[in-house]
Amino acid sequence: MTNIRKTHPLLKILNSSLVDLPAPSSLTSWWNFGSLLGICLAVQILTGLFLAMHYTSDTATAFNSVTHICRDVNYGWVLRYLHANGASMFFICLYLHVGRGLYYGSYTYTETWNIGILLLFAVMATAFMGYVLPWGQMSFWGATVITNLLSAIPYIGTDLVQWIWGGFSVDKATLTRFFAFHFLLPFIIAALVMVHLLFLHETGSNNPTGIPSDLDMIPFHPYYTIKDILGLLIMLTALSTLVLFSPDLLGDPDNYTPANPLNTPPHIKPEWYFLFAYAILRSIPNKLGGVLALVLSILILAIVPMLHTSKQQSMIFRPLSQCLFWLLVADLLTLTWIGGQPVEYPYVIIGQAASILYFSIILIFMPLISSVENHLLKW
């Protein structure tokens, strides 16, 4: 008799995705982050659901409701800090996942890659709106500054900003709609994840060598399930250590002050995972130019497949491209540091140089070096 997991209409979908899925035998730990992101999403949805049971999206009570969750709700502080630091873990895994895709040339699977970029935008939008909900100083001013950027759009900008605000400033209407969208978006993200996996399983996984692995496949279970469980344990250890020992390490102290429209904080900055994009935004003196650079800093990923000039898919056998890749990583870390610094000399000039380098590496140097490598290999 055939196993039920292979015949049942629902179970056979799970079976072909998680149990009997043929996977390349050479996948390294860099391929763990997809499953870790799935776990992060589940953790965020669950903790968020319980937080939403106690949160009130009203400007008069939002800040106090978060305090109430931490002080009066059973293990409310664990829920709150798991959710806040879970977002940081989510972004760490996201950036490593994208980095892996860039390094090993996974972007050649364009449908999967483009859905991934869409997912990245959706997660960033969700995180931004979530940061507004505690209604602290940084929440309020962050929302004001970032939504105000849309006013740079010619002709419709001002109307668009007021439409998003639901008035003439960030107020009760803004907070309520941000809460509604913050609750809704993770479920849209979950649906997009299914589409992401659907396209991935059409082509099969890439592997570190970048060479087709159809001749050498192994079943996903037990080999990669046990590998994913190890990755999960490491991530959960890191997350629980962060939550239990220094929950505010990655947060901003200003957010423990209730929002006050009459008092601007000395340095308005987003959460750490947006600092690189914020630095690129600030490095251009023109408002519209800054907004365009901000959007392009992520959207540039969409044209990476078109800029692939190498005859090899992966970077594993391309030392010159590897040097450029790690230069890009160092550049992004520099931008992240600059994003958290005040707008003054020498930070401004460093930020501008790092921003130019970021776009130059992706648009000019990567394709150029790939062509040079082809030439050196006489291809």
Curated annotation (Swiss-Prot):
Location(s), subcellular: Mitochondrion inner membrane
InterPro entries per record: Cyt_b/b6_C, Cyt_b/b6_C_sf, Cyt_b/b6_N, Cytb/b6-like_sf, Cytochrome_b, Cytochrome_b_C_euk/bac, Cytochrome_b_N_euk/bac, Di-haem_cyt_TM
GO biological process: mitochondrial electron transport, ubiquinol to cytochrome c
Gene3D superfamilies: Cytochrome Bc1 Complex, Chain C (1.20.810.10)
GO cellular component terms attached to this protein's record: mitochondrial inner membrane; respiratory chain complex III
Keywords: Electron transport, Heme, Iron, Membrane, Metal-binding, Mitochondrion, Mitochondrion inner membrane, Respiratory chain, Transmembrane, Transmembrane helix, Transport, Ubiquinone
Cofactor annotation: heme b
UniProt function note: Component of the ubiquinol-cytochrome c reductase complex (complex III or cytochrome b-c1 complex) that is part of the mitochondrial respiratory chain. The b-c1 complex mediates electron transfer from ubiquinol to cytochrome c. Contributes to the generation of a proton gradient across the mitochondrial membrane that is then used for ATP synthesis.
Protein name per UniProt: Cytochrome b
Origin species: Micronycteris hirsuta (Hairy big-eared bat)
Gene that this sequence comes from: MT-CYB
